[in-house]
Amino acid sequence: MAEKKPELQRGLEARHIELIALGGTIGVGLFMGAASTLKWAGPSVLLAYIIAGLFVFFIMRSMGEMLFLEPVTGSFAVYAHRYMSPFFGYLTAWSYWFMWMAVGISEITAIGVYVQFWFPEMAQWIPALIAVGLVALANLAAVRLYGEIEFWFAMIKVTTIIVMIIIGLGVIFFGFGNGGQAIGFGNLTEHGGFFAGGWKGFLTALCIVVASYQGVELIGITAGEAKNPQVTLRSAVGKVLWRILIFYVGAIFVIVTIFPWNEIGSNGSPFVLTFAKIGITAAAGIINFVVLTAALSGCNSGMYSCGRMLYALAKNRQLPAAVAKVSRHGVPVAGVALSILILLVGSCLNYIIPNPQRVFVYVYSASVLPGMVPWFVILISQLRFRRAHKEAIADHPFRSIMFPWANYLTMAFLVCVLIGMYFNEDTRMSLFVGVIFLLAVTLVYKVFGLNRHGTAHKVGE
């Protein structure tokens, strides 16, 4: 009898999945990028987070509906392959892989900068290299151990945000750190009004805010390794998005209410200022540590996703079969190792280019358009998924809402965001980089005849 090959193991519990998704979504962008969006929109950035969150909610409910019936590793890439075509499955998997590689390299770069806060003479490539090693060890461990590591990584930044929101509410309503005098809501309407940046500033910020939600769909990547996936994923999809909304909107609300929006960024990080407001003198060091772990957590979640995407491509015969190799611990070791190798090469940019901020901006911005591809694919796949599962949908306990209008509205919204990115000088280049990448992988697909290898699955296979 042939020896059974190792397979991915269902070792992730609900708490692991929820924190993996939170860890991938709430990253350096919230801690370091809040000042940028406030610069453009003023207090109305709050509304931008709420609007973007509503459309992301529609995307997540669409994905949750499919995950309940088909909890497979690779989720939306597999659904694209199955319900659209092998090409779209291929394009989605590579787009998501590219997005997380770009995010991973940018966050590894950021880690080098954060460590220099304590050790200013240290070359930035040294902590970057150490971080790659730590991420590799975490991702090559058994999936349950990986889930535990990421759980505690993500818990650090989640706890920090919760504490900051509580402190901020105390300052706003009870005057903590302000001589007992409540600050109130004056800063939301003063200094130019709620829409201080005008509609142009609001729409510019909205384009950036949408990108900050990328990573929430990581829940889908965990589907093939979740314990009792129908129950676990249904719970995770519902909880994670609400928590992200509360953390993002709550943190930004506290910042723009306590401080005049036009002063944020000029006097340091708003997170540092909030903790310093109540007399925590070590605020800068605390926040630097939190942002360091946030970068590690985001990169860790990203490498998890990258390994599973390469595994899905190999299973669809769009990469060599060797890439689908799974260790005895149930880890897609070949896919993870290849992704870590690219991350290692990318981290060498820290040695070649002396300006870390330039590396961070260029690489991170390149991830925006490829990161949107899975969202479009989820919405389109679900339209066809419904037609293929008419009987199962009738008594489905986790159906998406406002179907199919929510799908069409969300796709229209995403198209508007892309148009807005084109007309914004700060984001136009990232759009071009994304287009070039998508054209390149399409060319590879056609030239190497990968369509001959990637046959579409039958429904229910």
Curated annotation (Swiss-Prot):
Sequence similarity: Belongs to the amino acid-polyamine-organocation (APC) superfamily.
Protein name, entry field: Threonine/serine transporter ThrP
Catalyzed reaction equations: L-threonine(in) + H(+)(in) = L-threonine(out) + H(+)(out); L-serine(in) + H(+)(in) = L-serine(out) + H(+)(out)
Mode of membrane association: Multi-pass membrane protein
UniProt GO cellular component terms: plasma membrane
Cellular compartment(s): Cell inner membrane
Keyword match Membrane: yes
Membrane-traversing stretches: 17-37, 40-60, 97-117, 123-143, 156-176, 201-221, 244-264, 278-298, 333-353, 360-380, 401-421, 430-450
Species, as recorded: Salmonella typhimurium (strain LT2 / SGSC1412 / ATCC 700720)
UniProt keyword list: Amino-acid transport, Cell inner membrane, Cell membrane, Membrane, Transmembrane, Transmembrane helix, Transport
Main location group: membrane
Encoding gene per record: thrP
GO BP: amino acid transport; transmembrane transport
Pfam families membership: AA_permease
Summary of the function given for this chain in its UniProt record: Permease that mediates the proton-dependent threonine and serine uptake.
